[in-house]
Regions:
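A donor-sugar binding/catalytic signature common to diverse glycosyltransferases
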Residues: 171-212
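Anion (oxyanion) recognition and catalysis
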Residues: 33-34, 134-135, 161, 196
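Short, charged, surface-exposed secondary-structure boundary motifs
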Residues: 49-55, 99-104, 151-153, 177-178, ...
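Structural motif
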Residues: 19-23, 71-74, 115-120, 143-147, ...
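Conserved catalytic-core segment of nucleotide-activated headgroup transferases in glycan assembly
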Residues: 90-159
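Active-site and donor-binding regions of nucleotide-sugar-utilizing enzymes
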Residues: 1-95
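Nucleotide-activated donor-binding/catalytic signature segment of Leloir-type glycosyltransferases, i.e.
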Residues: 154-170
Length: 212
């Protein structure tokens, strides 16, 4: 990958390279850096203490970390020790989120509970249990994580539907779902923070990973 990307960048005469989830793009970043191309990471997820891909409190260095990091805001910029100087961490915000908030401001809230899945069995079970108990009072919607659509549909989707749970379409706009929903439940998805911007009350299942 490294030699191919280096050749590609050289031919295209790139000046800037934007990446998301930099720890999955290390060869690409290394190739860019070798040519003096400025590398910039856009925040995806929730950088926090204890997350090995972002927290370098130990003082260790990482040569393939991007030159600049554009965060969603000051909280994220200071939430952990990045392996770059503080002046290279820029609180850029989330313009796309703000645009969506305005786009869906006309939508009226429904008695809808959205489960923000990350493929954890406990959330699928939670969705089934809540739907069975409160099906006459609210709609339970299960928003799958993208990787739950990678291959054939998981077997537990059938169980969810049998319990009356609505499963979001793979192309559904999460922000529109938030705009319609009064409540959201999850464990450690960054989407939970985004849901708050739509006035969607947040509940976190107390299980492994919820501390993040």
């Amino acid at each position: 990958m490294y030699p191919l990307m280096r050749l590609f960048f050289k031919l295209k005469k790139l000046k800037l390279l934007f990446v998301v989830v930099s720890h999955t793009r290390e060869a690409t970043i290394a190739a860019a850096k070798s040519l003096g191309i400025t590398t910039i990471e856009l925040q995806h997820g929730s950088p926090a203490r204890g997350k090995l891909n972002y927290d370098y409190t130990s003082g260790s260095k990482k040569r393939t970390f991007p030159d600049l990091f554009l965060s969603f805001g000051d909280y994220w910029s200071s939430n952990c020790k990045f392996p770059i100087d503080k002046d290279k961490i820029i609180s850029f915000g989330n313009p796309y989120l703000y645009k969506k908030i305005n786009s869906y401001s006309h939508i009226v809230k429904e008695d809808r509970l959205v489960i923000i899945s990350q493929g954890t069995p406990i959330l699928a079970k939670f969705a089934r249990d809540i739907s069975k108990q409160f099906s006459k009072k609210l709609t339970v919607e299960y928003k799958p994580h993208p990787f739950e659509f990678y291959e054939q549909e998981p077997d537990y989707f059938i169980e969810l539907r049998n319990a009356g749970v609505v499963i979001s379409d793979r192309h559904a706009d999460l922000y529109e779902i938030f705009a319609r929903s009064r409540w959201q439940v999850g464990i450690f998805s960054t989407a939970l923070y985004e849901g708050l911007y739509f006035g969607t009350a947040c509940f976190v299942v107390n299980t492994i990973g919820s501390e993040n």
